[in-house]
Curated annotation (Swiss-Prot):
Gene source species: Ixodes scapularis
Subcellular location: Secreted
GO molecular-function term, one example from the UniProt record: toxin activity
Stated name of the protein: Salivary anticoagulant protein P23
UniProt keyword Glycoprotein, yes or no: yes
Induction comment from the UniProt entry of this chain: Up-regulated following blood feeding.
Major subcellular site: secreted
Highest classification ranks of the organism: Eukaryota, Metazoa, Ecdysozoa, Arthropoda, Chelicerata
Glycosylated position list: 56, 73, 109, 114
GO cellular component, one term: extracellular region
Record key words, sorted: Blood coagulation cascade inhibiting toxin, Glycoprotein, Hemostasis impairing toxin, Secreted, Signal, Toxin
Length: 222
């Protein structure tokens, strides 16, 4: 009877020491929602926003009677949401032991990160009016893969951080009068700019902060 009781206690102690899905979820949430927001305030590349340098482009006119070549001057772009919009999708995978290290894998969602642009245009109509308008580009339907690993008794580190194909939706001020063809080309320039800059940020400054955040949160081991 004593042997059975000791065995039961041993199994209970073992079970309580094994990390669960809940532990993995709590770890990921602490990294994303507690540590990243705290660390990001000391990262000038990301706080209070990431900056997109000025750029210019033109959109050809389509009808000499109604519009001219559209000249676009973007004086500033600001990307926000790195501290608030990155979230896990559902549950993380149960922590497992891989090559002597505990591994935590989660799918992340980047929807909601957005860029706003200070934009000056000329030529959307036949009189070539000068207009100061807003443009907003939002990340939609974009996920990524994350894995952190740690040896027992040591800090965790980022093993995998991969952002899947980034999707962006662009909207602009209704004060800008463009037909569908010109509107598509106009918005494409902003989409292309965001798709160029975001990966540089994700795999640069953000990944650096992610690593610091992971190493500062107690790691749940199996």
């Amino acid at each position: 009877m004593l042997t059975v009781s000791l065995l039961t206690l041993s199994l209970a102690a073992y079970a309580s020491a094994v990390a669960t899905v809940t532990d993995a979820n709590n770890f990921m949430d602490a990294v994303l929602h507690t540590r990243i927001p705290a660390l990001i305030t000391s990262e000038p590349i990301l706080f209070p926003f990431a900056t997109i340098p000025p750029f210019n482009f033109t959109v050809a006119g389509t009808n000499i009677l109604t519009n001219r070549e559209l000249q676009v001057n973007v004086s500033r772009g600001e990307i926000r949401g790195f501290s608030t919009e990155v979230k896990r999708v559902g549950d993380c995978m149960p922590p497992v032991l891989r090559e002597g290290k505990t591994s935590i894998r989660c799918t992340l969602n980047f929807t909601g990160i957005n860029a706003t642009f200070d934009t000056h245009t000329r030529g959307d109509n036949i009189v070539a009016s000068d207009k100061n308008i807003w443009v907003r580009a939002s990340v939609i339907d974009t996920t990524g893969q994350f894995e952190a690993v740690a040896e027992r008794g040591k800090q965790g580190n980022v093993h995998t951080f991969l952002v899947d194909k980034i999707h962006v939706k662009v909207k602009n001020d209704k004060a800008l009068s463009l037909n569908d063809k010109r509107k598509k080309k106009f918005r494409q320039h902003f989409e292309d700019k965001v798709l160029t800059v975001l990966p540089q940020i994700f795999y640069g400054a953000y990944l650096h902060l992610l690593g610091a955040a992971v190493s500062s949160v107690p790691f749940p081991h199996v």
